[in-house]
Amino acid sequence: MSSKGKFYMTTAIAYTSGKPHIGNTYEIVLADAIARYKRLEGYDVYFQTGTDEHGQKIELKAEEKGITPKQFVDEVAGEVKRIWDLMNTSYDNFVRTTDEDHETQVKKIFKKLYDKGDIYKGSYEGLYCTPCESFWTESQLVDGKCPDCGREVQPAKEEAYFFKMSKYADRLIEHINTHPEFIQPVSRKNEMMNNFLLPGLQDLCVSRTSFSWGIPVDFDPKHVVYVWLDALTNYITKIGYDADGNSSDLFKKNWPADLHLIGKDIIRFHTIYWPIFLMALDLPLPKQVFGHPWLLQGGEKMSKSKGNVIYADDMVDLFGVDATRYFVLHEMPFENDGIITWELVVERFNSDLANILGNLVSRTISMSNKYFDGVVKSTGVTEEVDNDLKAVVTGARDKIADKMSGLRVADAITEVFNVFRRCNKYIDETAPWVLAKDEAKKDRLSEVLYNLTESIAIGASLLASFLPETAEKIAAQLNTGLRGFDELNQFGLYPNDNKVTEEPEILFARLDPKEVMPKVEAIRAAQKAEFEAEQKASGKEVETEAKADAAVIDIEPKEEITYDDFMKMQFQVGEIIECKAVEKSKKLLCSQVRIGSQVKQIVSGIRKQYTPEEMVGKKVMVLVNLKPAKLAGVLSEGMLLCAEDETGELALLTPEKDMPAGAEIC
């Protein structure tokens, strides 16, 4: 297949403040599936990932451990790369922002922007969030805390360099409006436009003097470059960009990037800061930035103190690499956060991998061995039922291509497994064991087994981008190779009289939850013990079980209502498609909520708990038929349901499983 041209894609580079959990690992697996699929389609792919290794947070972490920042990031970067390799990811370049070539170019870029007048020297006095490496004004805080992560901010006053963001704002707005594919999903675009660009951009602080772990400004070395100007530029520096005009052939071939794949929490940096930096450098903008959702443990953020952090290597130990890949790819919706629990992983392993796929391959090969000594042959004895099987199998390629073109990877995997589901149905329809009892139907039996083997061979090739090791194993057991893209809509390419393996390997043996869950509990216990040891070593108070698991609250009972009273209330699942802070209020958010075919505007007092960015894409429970009322002068047409603890902390109620917007709550 001839090349369709270049495809340069990147993940966000992982921040080296600690070991990545499964939610972080999801991104590299997602990127790998996209990269493998693009190669299958015929693209010349260059896939870059790596680690972000500078900043105050890392300096403080290293200080806590009594080692240098470089020693600290060397350890964490090594761990990140180990996990990326464990997950069988096919990146072409693993970058580190402490690499000498990157640091050299960052200094040049800073100087170039300074000489151009886009960076100027001033002084900063305001507020700084160390975990987010972000600057904020008082008006941007939510209840006095960082609007991104909810943590405390610290006063900061220092000499600093600033970038003239407002100079390029109108140009960026025009680009976003004329390139609807630039920010995906669309809900992320709406966030950036409504919450940042349209209200107006402030100049950005791009240097610090209060810590030293960073790339020094070449002409003013008491300053270090702000971590985001450092980190974002890796996408060009590590493919050979040179600010002096001597860029490499690799850069000239691959820039602009075709895809930046990032978490939704850092989309602001990639769709506002980064394109403006590129405009200032007179470079073209990336073609698309996709902000993927988060993977949450049982609907809540992972915490070492709770022992609920899930790491990729623990999942691999229990389920294997491809089963881990399958879960994170299959369970993540396009826009909404995904849910992971150990119990759900076991359920998917047994139902999808062991039953639908593994059992199909094993049964088919076993029947070929039992009835024909492993020889697979098409006899031409066809029946009407064969046509539908062939249509499903040969039609899958284009359906998957359509899903992958929109980065709907979970939907693409579902299409692959629809091939295997159709094969299982075909076995039930043709009943090979019945055909085997009648010698006159031997040729028909041979045709049935050929059709199954050919379908599985095509299915394995379609599966290869997502579960590469499993695809290779299936092809090996069928004694054939994986096919190219142009062959995946053709039926009948499996060689006649080919022989399958005599002893099929069990791809995925069913798991007994009673055996798995004790191992999970041991992992949780080890995590909590490690966390407590870390807390004690750093002199911090260890959170007690009672504090962590305060599980019950009694509230004042209200007057009883009748069943008829209750039935007057209409509850439905809603999907938040836009959200912004209500002006002149520190508590209120205004959300546009899709409920079925209609969109309602709902004002909620949850600004303390959620940022507008976090809200977009959530599926929530809504009281739909509440009489409209104005809150802080803004019309509200319903109510989002929340739970409240004894401290007044609120948490939105969300469906346990992904449900369509408009589904009735009953």
Where are these regions (language model features)?
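Helix-rich, typically C-terminal accessory recognition domains appended to large enzymatic cores
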Residues: 121, 331, 343-381, 392-500, ...
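Intrinsic disorder at enzyme termini
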Residues: 471-565
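Beta-strand segments within the central parallel beta-sheet cores of soluble alpha/beta enzyme folds
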Residues: 288-291, 475-477, 590
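Phosphate-backbone binding interfaces of nucleic-acid-interacting proteins
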Residues: 542-666
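A glycine-rich helix N-cap at a beta->alpha junction
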Residues: 78-92
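N-terminal catalytic cores of NTP/NDP-binding nucleotidyl/phosphoryl-transfer enzymes
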Residues: 2-76, 95-110, 115, 132, ...
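Cys/His-rich short segments
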Residues: 116-169, 173
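Structured secondary-structure scaffolds
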Residues: 2-49, 101-105, 149, 155-370, ...
